[in-house]
Amino acid sequence: MLKKSDNKMTDQAYWCVVSGSDIWVNDDQFPFGSAEELGLSVEHAICIGQHQGRKVYWLNDCDVEIELSMVSLRDLLHWPESSFLIASKAIQYGHMTQSMRFCPQCGGRNHLNHNQVAMQCGDCRTLHYPRIFPCIIVAVRNDNKILLAQHPRHKTGMYTVIAGFLEVGETLEQCVAREVKEETGIDVSNIRYFGSQPWAFPSSMMMAFLADYAGGTLKPDYSELSDAQWFDVTSLPDVAPVGTIARQLIENTVDDIRKASVAEQELEH
């Protein structure tokens, strides 16, 4: 539930002012203080939770009269998870209010319903909840190697694991197998859940898996990828940044391979 506060002008609180995928930060942390001290107008400020025992307020930058120094959410991947998730939440709420201004049922004007985390039509009263796009992301292992791919959108040339959107009528496990097959031509088995991460670019939920190579020849789909290779864990390329669940998958797989290698060496001796 979103909460309005009668004390927004004087509350000592953290503030999340967002614009698209950008957020206001001060000295690499959430700005802290009262709205009065920070020069913020609070008519549209909404409490979206707590951080370190203090309220967190969200505002869209269009509701702020002063110019603020904004940074991309991607630049905050080094933040502690609790802080990054709060920033992600604010950005996703901002995206909801900006992308769902009109009701798809009747065309009426939507407004934010503070009792439901949703936009509500002023005419037909239909509630429209935030759009969350489910995606899978998977690290595939083949003995002592990991499958990594390079995407044209990654200008730095980094490599990462395979990912894709869930289709209608599809289980997560089916999606894992399909995406790997479509993008690389290989089959996988032993698909197992690893973890998840909200990914506010603009509103995805990444559901992470581990899988094992089961067969097929690596044939990258060059309409989707720039490259895909099996990499030995001793010679990895530049990979996804720290803070991403892609990096967690890669590190977990590399650790498992190294542990297995050590165990094999101990058995030989």
UniProtKB/Swiss-Prot annotation:
Entry-linked Gene3D superfamilies: 3.90.79.20, Nucleoside Triphosphate Pyrophosphohydrolase
- So where does a divalent metal cation 2 get bound? E179
| Protein family according to the UniProt entry | Belongs to the Nudix hydrolase family. NudC subfamily.
Instruction: Write down the required cofactor(s).
Output: Mg(2+); Mn(2+); Zn(2+)
Q: Which residues bind a divalent metal cation 1?
A: A163, E183, E224
Q: Where does Zn(2+) bind?
A: C103, C106, C121, C124
Under which main EC class is this enzyme filed?
hydrolase
PROSITE patterns attached here? NUDIX, NUDIX_BOX
UniProt keyword NAD, yes or no: yes
Q: Fetch the Pfam families from UniProt.
A: NUDIX, Zn_ribbon_NUD
Per UniProt, where does substrate bind?
R74, Y129, Q197, P198, W199, A200, F201, P202, S203, S204, A246
What positions does the record give for the motif labelled Nudix box?
Answer: 164-185
Q: Which organism is it from?
A: Vibrio atlanticus (strain LGP32) (Vibrio splendidus (strain Mel32))
Which key words tag this protein in UniProt? Hydrolase, Magnesium, Manganese, Metal-binding, NAD, Zinc
Reactions that this protein is recorded to catalyse: a 5'-end NAD(+)-phospho-ribonucleoside in mRNA + H2O = a 5'-end phospho-adenosine-phospho-ribonucleoside in mRNA + beta-nicotinamide D-ribonucleotide + 2 H(+); NAD(+) + H2O = beta-nicotinamide D-ribonucleotide + AMP + 2 H(+); NADH + H2O = reduced beta-nicotinamide D-ribonucleotide + AMP + 2 H(+)
Q: Tell me the domain of life.
A: Bacteria
CC cofactor note: Divalent metal cations. Mg(2+) or Mn(2+). Binds 1 zinc ion per subunit.
Q: Quick one: which gene encodes this?
A: nudC
State the GO CC annotations. Answer: cytosol
Residues that, per the record, bind a divalent metal cation 3: E179, E183, E224
Q: Which residues form the Nudix hydrolase domain?
A: 130-253
The protein here is known as NAD-capped RNA hydrolase NudC
| Description of how the protein assembles with itself and partners | Homodimer.
